């Protein structure tokens, strides 16, 4: 029986699971009764995440006149919705950067995904009263090809076959090859992975249909 995208995600769920810290943070972020200090207490358990958050809060993007030195203050500056998106994006990048995919391919993947995320964020800012925040759309762009990483890691021989047969001059050739060789495409794999992480439906759908937007 041929492997499906659902089965591929299920068999690798223990390897590519988001840290427990994410679950705890999301619970607090979604709880209107929680305080910024309670959220900060969880973030401070991860030194790397704490440093990244302070760096972002002190960036020119937020333009705060004085230096932000505490996590709770950084949360106030960034906001809870944006914070959740930033933490998710950083956690996913860290998760796959520990993989055995060669560095050059991984850098190429994240460069493309980052450009998609930045483009999605800018487009969202041009829309009056958008349904989703610009930062949510940034994360959607960042994660849209996440299924490719899982295929590269779990099915390297088939991924190599797809790469060798790929013709960049043929529109949509990569995912058509995936359907032929695997029986499913990276968009299906990615959306199933995001489902297993219990991520927002908008991220699941943008990942699932990014090659078929007319089907959303």
Residue ranges and their predicted role:
Residues 1-163, 167-216:
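Conserved alpha-helical "signature site"
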